[in-house]
């Protein structure tokens, strides 16, 4: 129950407009502060066994000279030297490798950055992309939609320090919020109609496509109830809800129907 409430908080921006701060940034800032505490505390710690992300990070910081950044900003680690320097057991080494692998996935998915001093920061400001609205009225959406779902699931599966629900929820909210890089309503035009070739040639508006995408991608980590409740809270927040929408989580039933279609499509493929 606590997880559901936290997810609703993250998915519902404090300020609905993209130009202003939202709750997802606040959550990530809190996590970044906690990571900075781990970073600072690690100076005085002595790791005797590597059994957690915190242990692995502490060991990494102790031997910064054995870590370098690749051209894509992922971490390159000299594991042989780590074993020699710390007399690591096989289990210790596997835990360290697992931590590094998770960090590199998060870097690749643009969920975190790691600087030259190995300070981890979850990305709180996702730059907007310049999107040219398609001229064609026949489009396909499932390739990018599936790709986004896979990215979100990777962030969830690889979040470090036990933060998966908060981190993945923030990652999702930053991207689907109004004006976000996954906001198809803005990219395609709210009322512009398209024939979606890879959804049985369905005739859908940009708004309908955005709601479908939200449902499909979000379902990779969230329950249907969480997704639809969050959508309703957004409508309440901007004053576009109606008491007669109570059966659809106070969201417009047409929006909820498209969200449900996205959820159903994801469920049918997984």
Residue ranges and their predicted role:
Residues 2-12:
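Bacterial N-terminal signal peptides
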Residues 10-27:
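Sec-dependent signal peptide cleavage junction
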Residues 25-66:
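N-terminal mature-domain "stem" immediately C-terminal to a signal peptide or N-terminal signal-anchor/transmembrane
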Residues 49-212:
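Glycine-rich short-loop/terminal segments
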Residues 158, 164-165, 176, 227-230, ...:
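Calcium-binding acidic motifs and repeat modules
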Residues 213-216, 244-245:
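Polytopic alpha-helical membrane-helix bundles and their juxtamembrane interface segments
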Residues 215-223, 265:
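Well-ordered alpha-helical scaffold segments within catalytic/enzyme domains
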Residues 229-270:
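Active-site or metal-binding loop neighborhoods of secreted/extracellular toxin and effector enzymes
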